[in-house]
Amino acid sequence: MTKYVFVTGGVVSSLGKGIAAASLAAILESRGLQVTLLKLDPYINVDPGTMSPFQHGEVFVTEDGAETDLDLGHYERFISAKMHKVNNFTTGQIYESVLRKERRGDYLGKTVQVIPHITNEIQDFIARGADAAWNGATDVAIVEIGGTVGDIESLPFLEAARQMSLRLGRNNAAFVHLTLVPFIASAGELKTKPTQHSVQKLREIGIYPNLLLCRADRPIPDDERAKISMFSNVPLDAVISVWDADSIYKIPAMLHKQGVDNIVCEALGLTPPPADLSMWDNLVDALEHPTHQLTIGMVGKYVDLTESYKSLSEALVHAGIHTRSKINIEYIDSEDIETRGTDQLKHLDAILVPGGFGKRGTEGKIAAIRYARENGVPYLGICLGMQLAVIEFARHVAGLGGANSTEFDPSAPHPVVALITEWMDREGKVEKRDATSDLGGTMRKGAQRCPVKPGTRAQAIYGDDVNERHRHRYEVNNVYVPRLEEAGMVISARTPTENLPEMMELPDHPWFVGVQFHPEFTSTPRDGHPLFSSFIEAAIANHARKEA
C-alpha cells in the first residue's frame, strides 16, 4: 500500500516547496524506497502551456508530452522515477473532469459541490498519479500542494489531503509544512510569529503537521526552534532549520543531517535501510572543486526572470559537474543586443540561444548567432535557437536575403522556418493543425526518437539515434534544406516519418549545433547530458585558445 507525504507551504510563496519535496524524495530513495512525486496547482488554467514565463516560469515537458509545472523538472533531477501527465494537475483539470462527469449523468441528479465531488476527484487524481509509478508498487508518494496556506484557491486541495489522510489511517500519511522565519534587520533578530500563525491556520482546517521546515537566510538557533515547537505543538526535533544554500544539491544532506527522513519514516511506520547520500556528496564536491571557470552567454528575452530557463540553467550546471567546471551563466537580453551590438559578447566562452516564442528580440538573437558563427565561438541553439541559426545561415551564407520564419513574417520571401501542419506523435497518432488552431495543447510535444546521420558531430554525441522531448509549432522548411546543405550546413538528424530536420551543425566551425528538441529536460546531476557536456568541453577549449 502506498503511503503519502503532503507538503504544504505557509507565510509566502516561492520558499522552495519543490526543492524540499524533491530532496526528501531523494533521501527516501537512497534508503531503498520506491518514491514518486506529484504537484497540485490551484490555478484554473488546464496547464501552464499558455501562461507567460514571467508569471509562471518555465514549462517543463514530460516524456509523454504534458506541459507541467517547473517543479516536475526538480523531481526528475532528484530521483530516478520519470514524471508523467498524471504527476501534475490543476484546479482547471479537476473542474473539467467533474463537469464532464456531471454532463454524462455520473452523479445521478445530485447537486455537485466542492465537498464531496471536487475533493473526491482530487483524491482520485492523487491516487492515480501515485499508482502510475513503479508499476503500481510505489512505496511513498510525496504530494506538493501549490500555493500558500490561507489562500482561498488551495482550500479544496488541503481539504482533500485532510480527508485522504483520515481515510488512509494511522501511519499511512504525514504532513510536512514549509514556512518562513524572516530576519528583521532593524531588530537584528529572526521572527517566529509568521510561522506560528501559519501552523495555526493549518490546524484550523484539521491538518496537524508532523514536521516543520523553517526557511531562513541563516541557521535558526535552538531557542527560536524551541519557541516554534511550543507554539505550534510540533516536537522540537521535528522543527527543522533550512537556511539558504549556494546549491540546491546540498539540501538533501542538510535535511538528512537533521533527521528529516527518520521523522517521516517513523510517521509512516517504515523501517528502511540507512540513507546513502554518497552520490550527492560527490556532486557537491565536484561543484566546490572545479578545475575550469567558464562564462556562458544565454541570449533570450525572459532574462529578467531566470526561472524561465530553469532546466536549461541546471543542465549547464550538470555539465559543469561532469567536466569539473564552474559555470557562470550570463543572461543577456536579446533586445539589448539589437540596440548596443555584439561587443558585449566578446568575453564569452560559448553562446546559447534557448527556446522561446514571438518576434520580439529575435533580431538580437540572430546577431548573437552570427557573431558566434563568424568568430568560432561554440554555439548551441535549442528549439527557436536552432530555427534562428538556420535563418541567420540562410541570410548571410546561403544567399537567401529576407529569410525568416512565418511565425515572425508570414509574407517572408524565403520562409526557411514554417508552421508544421501534420505530424505523428509518439504513439503513432497523426496530429493536424493550422494557423487558426487553439494555442493551448496544440504543439508537437513529448519524447520522440529519430536516427542520426553517420559521421556527424551529432553521432559523436548521441550515437546512432536520439530520443528527446519537444515543445514547438514551427519546423525548418524542407523545401530550403538542399540550398542550405549546398552552402555547407549539415542536417544531422531527421524525424523518421515526416523527415523533418531535428539537428543541424556546421562542420567547418569548432562547435556549432542546433537542435529542434529540448535536451535540458532529460539532464540530471547524476548523469549529466552528452550534448551539454560536449558543449562545455568546446567552451573549455575556446577559453584555453583565448588565454593562449
Swiss-Prot record:
Domain Glutamine amidotransferase type-1, residue spans: 295-545
EC number: 6.3.4.2
Pathway named in the protein's UniProt entry: Pyrimidine metabolism; CTP biosynthesis via de novo pathway; CTP from UDP: step 2/2
Residues that bind ATP: S14, L15, G16, K17, G18, I19, D71
UniProt-listed GO biological process terms: 'de novo' CTP biosynthetic process; pyrimidine nucleobase biosynthetic process
Entry binding sites for L-glutamine: G356, L384, G385, M386, Q387, E407, R473
Catalyzed reactions: UTP + L-glutamine + ATP + H2O = CTP + L-glutamate + ADP + phosphate + 2 H(+); L-glutamine + H2O = L-glutamate + NH4(+); UTP + NH4(+) + ATP = CTP + ADP + phosphate + 2 H(+)
Positions contributing to CTP binding: S13, D151, I152, E153, K191, T192, K193, P194, T195, Q196, K227
Family annotation (InterPro entries): Class_I_gatase-like (IPR029062), CTP_synthase (IPR004468), CTP_synthase_N (IPR017456), GATASE (IPR017926), GATase1_CTP_Synthase (IPR033828), P-loop_NTPase (IPR027417)
Keywords annotated in UniProt: ATP-binding, Glutamine amidotransferase, Ligase, Magnesium, Metal-binding, Nucleotide-binding, Pyrimidine biosynthesis
Region (Amidoligase domain): 1-270
Annotated positions binding Mg(2+): D71, E144
Coiled-coil residue windows: none
Active site: C383 (nucleophile), H518, E520
Record's keyword annotation contains Chaperone: no
PANTHER family: CTP SYNTHASE (PTHR11550), CTP SYNTHASE-RELATED (PTHR11550:SF0)
Subunit comment: Homotetramer.
Protein name: CTP synthase
Species this chain originates from: Bordetella petrii (strain ATCC BAA-461 / DSM 12804 / CCUG 43448)
Lineage, broadest ranks: Bacteria, Pseudomonadati, Pseudomonadota, Betaproteobacteria, Burkholderiales
